[in-house]
Amino acid sequence: IILILILMNLKKFKKLSGDASFRQFYRTNNSILVYSKIQKRSNLLNYDSVNKILIKNKILAPGLISQNYKKNFIEIEDFGNKNMLDKIKSSKTKLNEYKKILKILYQIQKIKNFKTQNFLKKEFNLSNYSKAKILKESYLFLDWYLSANKLIIQKGHLKKNLKKLIDNLYLNLKIKHKVFVHRDFHVSNMMFYKNKIALIDSQDAVLGNPAYDLASLIDDVRIKTSNSFKSNILKVFLSKFKYKNESQFINDFEILSVLRNLKI
């Protein structure tokens, strides 16, 4: 079906608002077309592969319907328009909605097999969320925000000192074992479909710190919640997982919340 659609005018299909990336999304009658720039089309392979891992572990994610990799397209399931951000905003029992999301997080952190085959029949395995990758993302704050503010840049060695501070934050992370990390575990990346929660935008998943996705969820700057509400969510998560060393988890949660919000 994708090859046929490519030969047609894409303007006939509804273009959806996507993320700030190299991808474009179009809605057909009952599916979503994902188009990628040719330089980044390997991202389509990653998206399909990660979705396969999630689906295999009974987590709702968009399944592949068809693909035309040569034309930079894949066709995936459509989970509708309602995401969990909309549902939470209209809910009178917000904590209950977050508890449902925490169950999904619990499921993905229990995944043990991180290997699969992409639709080109090549092996895929989740990569590690390395120190270099995390710091590179956090340094975006220095490259984008500070560079845009010339007055700040002129204040001596501020940029250099902030870089040292970021490095020291990373060095203070305590937890060593790694789990499946979605990396964009926000309520806007969760669709509410047929009374279930579906994860989307999972192509950047890695093996990393178990506190990372929780920090993404709780300290998401796009949705306002009180500090007491955030503390309640953290308590619910810790009680579910029964971490032996909660102080280590909270330490890493706080550090990763800072590091990941620096790149926004």
Language-model features: locations:
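Short, Lys/Arg-enriched N-terminal segments with co-localized hydrophobic residues
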Residues: 1-7
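ATP-binding glycine-rich phosphate-binding loop
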Residues: 10-26
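A short beta-turn/loop motif at secondary-structure boundaries
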Residues: 16-20, 66-69, 256-257
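Active-site acidic catalytic loop and adjacent metal/ATP-binding pocket
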Residues: 22-28, 33, 108-109, 166-214, ...
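ATP-binding pocket architecture of kinase catalytic cores
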Residues: 26-136, 174
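An alpha-helical support segment within catalytic cores of ATP-dependent transferases
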Residues: 113, 124, 132-133, 137-180, ...
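All-alpha amphipathic helical-bundle segments outside canonical DNA-binding/catalytic cores
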Residues: 126-129, 246-257
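Active-site activation/catalytic loop segments of kinase-like enzymes and analogous catalytic loops
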Residues: 139-149, 210-244, 259-264
